[in-house]
């Protein structure tokens, strides 16, 4: 009888530990999603402010440029849209988000200092790294050689009124990438959610 009680207490303790780890994981996912939503909103606000400062003719000219523009992050293999993201594994979504955030470490310094974007990106990257570590169970982790050495282009070097095209590209790419990361983290969070009715 004593063995049964010991075994039962081990099983109960194991379940409680597992449930606690799940809640901690959910808390970390919530924090990551909130942080990237804030960055996406900041990017949208910066873009709106930039466009409002343009003359109508400049605005018209720049709107033709971006669809043809190349973003630094376009070289990162990533799901195209929400449908493809929903078919990807949580670990792949986290890896992709990590690499997208990492690709902005240097360029974010050129975005000015609205609420310290570089610091917010570093915090988010660290949080995603913790989530990756928590998801890795016998799977390949994020190795040092898996980190991105960004191929910076000239348009990532300057954000100034003197070069509207470069500034517009930088802000557009930042906004686009924060939207991607927000989508990927939201899908991953939903997949790991205890709520079976989690929808995006």
Curated annotation (Swiss-Prot):
Keyword terms, alphabetized: Disulfide bond, Hormone, Metal-binding, Secreted, Signal, Zinc
GO terms under biological process: animal organ development; growth hormone receptor signaling pathway; hyperosmotic salinity response; positive regulation of growth; positive regulation of receptor signaling pathway via JAK-STAT; response to L-arginine; response to peptide hormone; response to starvation
Location of the protein in the cell: Secreted
InterPro entries assigned to the protein according to its UniProt record, in alphabetical order: 4_helix_cytokine-like_core (IPR009079), Somatotropin (IPR034975), Somatotropin/Prolactin (IPR001400), Somatotropin_CS (IPR018116)
MF GO annotations: growth hormone activity; growth hormone receptor binding; metal ion binding
Keyword Metal-binding (UniProt): yes
Cysteine pairings via disulfide bonds: 71-173, 190-198
Top-level taxon: Eukaryota
A GO cellular-component term linked to this record: extracellular space
Record's signal peptide: 1-22
Annotated binding of Zn(2+), by residue: 38, 182
Short name of one Pfam family: Hormone_1
Role this protein plays: Growth hormone plays an important role in growth control and is involved in the regulation of several anabolic processes. Implicated as an osmoregulatory substance important for seawater adaptation.
Family: Belongs to the somatotropin/prolactin family.
Protein name per UniProt: Somatotropin
């Amino acid at each position: 009888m004593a063995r049964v009680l010991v075994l039962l207490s081990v099983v109960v303790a194991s379940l409680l530990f597992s449930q606690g780890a799940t809640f901690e994981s959910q808390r970390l996912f919530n924090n990551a999603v909130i942080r990237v939503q804030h960055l996406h909103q900041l990017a949208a606000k910066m873009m709106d402010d930039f466009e409002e400062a343009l003359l109508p003719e400049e605005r018209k000219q720049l709107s033709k440029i971006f669809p043809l523009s190349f973003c630094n992050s376009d070289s990162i293999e990533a799901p195209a849209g929400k449908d493809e993201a929903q078919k990807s594994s949580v670990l792949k979504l986290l890896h992709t988000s990590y690499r997208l955030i990492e690709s902005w470490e240097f360029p974010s310094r050129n975005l000015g200092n609205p609420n310290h974007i570089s610091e917010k990106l570093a915090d988010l990257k660290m949080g995603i790294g913790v989530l990756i570590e928590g998801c890795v169970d016998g799977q390949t982790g994020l190795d040092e050689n898996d980190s991105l050495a960004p191929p910076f282009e000239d348009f990532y070097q300057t954000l100034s009124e003197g070069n509207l095209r470069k500034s517009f590209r930088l802000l557009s790419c930042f906004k686009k990438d924060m939207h991607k990361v927000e989508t990927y983290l939201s899908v991953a969070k939903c997949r790991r959610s205890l709520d079976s009715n989690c929808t995006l």
